[in-house]
């Protein structure tokens, strides 16, 4: 494992370097120098996470070899909490209570289990304070203040499922201390990654408070924001967090189960819409903070809702955008073709290079993206985003950033194409991609 990760680090160093990126981006908490890699529960597990299910995915992440390629986060999303008719049930200090019917050993034990596998543990929360905390007027840990002292009951936060979260008035004494107590609890449980969901422009004070609180714990906790964040606040998200979701959910919610759960997990329209947002947000990404395109739905073959070509294109776009690579599939039933995709260290190296690519061609279904390596080479991705008919996609080397000829290597196959003069052309099937490294001559 160490040798492979060391090789990836060398590859990333080769790609990123002087002239390859701007100054360090995002939070200066020293975390997420490269985009996070791992697995998240929402796409596949959805509303029914349990201790056993999360452990099974952690086991698979480790035993499949994905961990050896850098996929190390096991992230528990929503529905770890217990709800009643008034919203979230709370502990004695007004924080969400764990649903012990799902997690009988508690969250710390689950985090310890992940850590024992050489993995990291991620967790989930939303802004605000629970209605039940205000109704009970629970004390704020370590202070003389109570929930009613800090709640703005005239406004409710966006909480997608349990609901009934009031805004916090951060001008009130005790507000920061409440968030501090929650962050301290998460740190004591061994949380390594925290996703705060339902964030919008009105939640900047919450993001500031959580950033401050997480730092104060003394534990390194990767701080992720979700979802569909307004780009108008891009500089703020960049300053405070380690990643931010640039669009709504990748899931199509078109499965046969309740609330659209089950397979398929996504569809091509939900993936192809990411090309536009990746281009719009490109300038905000860099070491310390990344544009999050959402879960990578690779691992379960075609049943996830994408063809093999579309899955390769999805991975290619995520890698070119330097997005976090958080798998949303069932790793206990890992498809062989998909495993080969996910363990392609050339693709992972492109994602982990610290550079978000820019789009240089966008014409109908034809897209071309490029990024420059520290040694003067370029990584170039060509796409046919259409759903019918082949497309001949071309790019001039002058559009990529140089002139003359180049030695070309296909990064998906590893095969050297040879010398190509002036431009590069590929005929691509619907949803297909070509990812190359070009070494100017």
Feature map (PLM): residue ranges:
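Structural recognition of the beta-strand scaffold that forms the well-ordered cores
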Residues: 35-41, 70-77, 120-125, 187, ...
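Aromatic-lined carbohydrate-binding/catalytic grooves of carbohydrate-active enzymes
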Residues: 61-113, 117-193, 198
């Amino acid at each position: 494992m160490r040798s492979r990760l060391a090789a990836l680090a060398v590859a990333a160093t080769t790609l990123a370097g002087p002239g390859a990126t701007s100054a360090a981006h995002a939070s200066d908490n020293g975390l997420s120098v490269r985009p996070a890699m791992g697995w998240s529960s929402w796409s596949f597990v959805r509303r029914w996470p349990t201790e056993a299910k999360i452990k099974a995915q952690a086991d698979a992440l480790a035993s499949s070899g994905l961990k050896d390629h850098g996929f190390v986060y096991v992230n528990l999303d929503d529905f770890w909490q217990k709800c009643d008719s008034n919203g979230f049930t709370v502990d004695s200090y007004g924080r969400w209570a764990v649903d012990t019917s799902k997690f009988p050993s508690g969250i710390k034990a689950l985090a310890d289990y992940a850590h024992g596998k050489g993995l990291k543990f991620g967790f989930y929360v939303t802004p605000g304070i629970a209605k039940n905390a205000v109704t009970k007027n629970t004390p704020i840990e370590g202070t003389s203040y109570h929930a009613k002292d800090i709640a703005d009951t005239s406004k409710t936060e966006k909480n997608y499922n349990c609901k009934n979260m009031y805004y916090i008035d951060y001008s009130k004494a005790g507000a920061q201390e409440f968030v501090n107590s929650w962050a301290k609890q998460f740190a004591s449980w061994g949380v390594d990654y925290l996703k705060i969901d339902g964030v919008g422009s009105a939640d900047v004070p919450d993001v500031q408070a959580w950033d401050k609180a997480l730092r104060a714990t003394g534990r390194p906790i990767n701080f992720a924001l979700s979802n569909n964040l307004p780009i108008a606040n891009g500089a703020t998200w960049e300053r405070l967090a380690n990643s931010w979701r640039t669009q709504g959910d990748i899931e199509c919610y078109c499965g046969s189960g309740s609330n659209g759960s089950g397979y398929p997990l996504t569809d091509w329209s939900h993936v192809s819409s990411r090309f536009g947002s990746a281009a719009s947000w490109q300038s905000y990404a860099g070491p310390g903070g990344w544009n999050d395109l959402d879960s990578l739905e690779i691992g379960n073959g075609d049943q996830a809702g994408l063809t093999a070509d579309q899955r390769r294109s999805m991975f290619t776009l995520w890698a070119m955008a330097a997005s976090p690579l958080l798998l949303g599939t069932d790793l206990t039933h890992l498809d062989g073709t998909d495993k080969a995709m996910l363990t392609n260290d050339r693709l992972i190296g492109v994602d982990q290079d610290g550079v978000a690519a820019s789009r240089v061609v966008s014409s109908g279904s034809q897209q071309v993206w490029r990024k420059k390596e520290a040694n003067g080479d370029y990584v170039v991705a060509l796409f046919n985003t259409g759903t019918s008919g082949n497309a001949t996609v071309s790019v001039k080397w002058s559009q990529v950033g140089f002139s003359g000829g180049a030695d070309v290597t296909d990064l998906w196959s590893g095969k050297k194409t040879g010398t190509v003069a002036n431009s590069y052309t590929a005929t691509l099937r619907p949803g297909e991609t070509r990812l190359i490294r070009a070494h100017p001559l």
